[in-house]
Amino acid sequence: TDPYFDMVIDCSPDLKINGGLGSISEQLIDSGVHVALGGGMKHFTPLAEGSDQTVLELAKESGYQLVSNATELDGSGAGKLLGLFSPSTMPVMWRGQDDRAAEKPDPSFLNRIHSMLGSVTYPEPMDCESNPEYIDIPSISLMTQTALDRLTEEDERNFFLMVESASIDKQSHQRKACGSIGELKQLDESLAVAMKFAESHPDTLILVTADHGQAAQLVPERTLYSGIP
């Protein structure tokens, strides 16, 4: 069980029978949004509230084409599109060498008594490598391009598109710098796709922002590893 992503929360007040709006997956399908791409397949497989059909089945009835990997996404046709590419959070593109996360320094006994005494052993630097779980997973840039293509199928269509590289934050919570950096790279590549679109659609407004910073992104002014190429 992942302590960050699999929390049990009482959502009974949000049930439709209790006056709520229902699950987020049900709200998404009910909204009629034209394109939705990401992870979270497990939230669409339970029965919809008060129904003998799953949320996924209701999505198909509502006209959504369902795709579940990069190959299917790349070959998808016109119309409303629902892409669910993993049971929960999507795998990241990069990971630390042998799946390493950032490790804590190891202070000596004297250094624990006072920072000016003894010594501190620092972790060895690590390389980033491709994540072996990142198989047939669509890149954020592919999802961005697909969404832009779908949203401009009809002439003069006005639209709002939100693109998020959520695992920049999620990987930082687990001290997985390579995962976070790889997802930042993905976001940069998707921005390039959007900027290219804007060149031929000059009335496009692109906003790039972050909802908060991360302690993992704070580095000392004089890095301990400045001599490493």
Predicted feature descriptions by range:
Residues 2-229:
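A post-motif C-terminal structural segment
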